[in-house]
Design a protein with these regions (language model features):
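Conserved GNAT-fold acetyl-CoA-binding loop/helix
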Residues: 3-26
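A short helix-loop-beta-strand connector motif used in the catalytic cores of GNAT acetyltransferases and
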Residues: 26-38
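Conserved beta-strand in the GNAT
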Residues: 36-38, 44-53
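Glycine-rich acyl-CoA binding loop
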Residues: 39, 77-82
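Conserved donor-binding loop and adjoining core beta-sheet/short helix segment
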Residues: 49-63, 67
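A short, internal acetyl-CoA/4′-phosphopantetheine-binding micro-motif in the GNAT/acyltransferase core
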Residues: 66-76
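Conserved beta-strand-loop-alpha-helix junction that forms the acyl-donor binding cleft
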Residues: 76, 88, 93, 98-109, ...
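Conserved active-site alpha-helix within GNAT-family acetyltransferase domains
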Residues: 82, 86, 103-121
Length: 127
């Protein structure tokens, strides 16, 4: 599923098997930074989510990044994305939730806005 997600238009990088393996190993190692979740419907795996924990000096509180949120095509629009975000809110009720979304991903943007997210007015950079 990670390969499907990173090959989709929802992500601007393609990832690699090496990165996917490192991500999964980090999740199952009991990492303080990364958590992985399997999303199921009717006892079938239909998606996954990954959360990264940090602290936001900008907002003065713990921060949880929704790094990945992927649902198979046939399960989009069924409320599972909203349920996952509500679950994360319940796990981290006092944390700032952040995520990235491609500007063209209108359906995801609608879900995130309904869940209370809004846009920040700056660009993200990496090194």
């Amino acid at each position: 599923m990670m390969q499907e997600f990173y090959a989709s238009d929802a992500v601007s990088t393609n990832g690699s098997l090496e990165i996917f393996e490192a991500d999964i190993n980090e999740c199952i190692s009991g990492s303080a930074y990364l958590e992985g979740y399997v999303i199921e419907r009717d006892d079938t795996t239909v998606g996954y989510g990954m959360l990264a924990r940090s602290y936001s000096t900008e907002f003065g509180k713990p921060c949880v990044w929704i790094e990945d949120l992927y649902l198979k095509d046939e399960c989009r629009g069924c409320g599972l994305g909203t349920q996952f975000i509500e679950y994360v809110n319940g796990l981290y009720p006092n944390a700032l939730l952040r995520l990235e979304v491609e500007a063209e991903n209108d359906s995801a943007i609608r879900v995130y806005k309904r869940c209370g997210f809004d846009f920040l007015p700056y660009l993200e950079m990496k090194k």
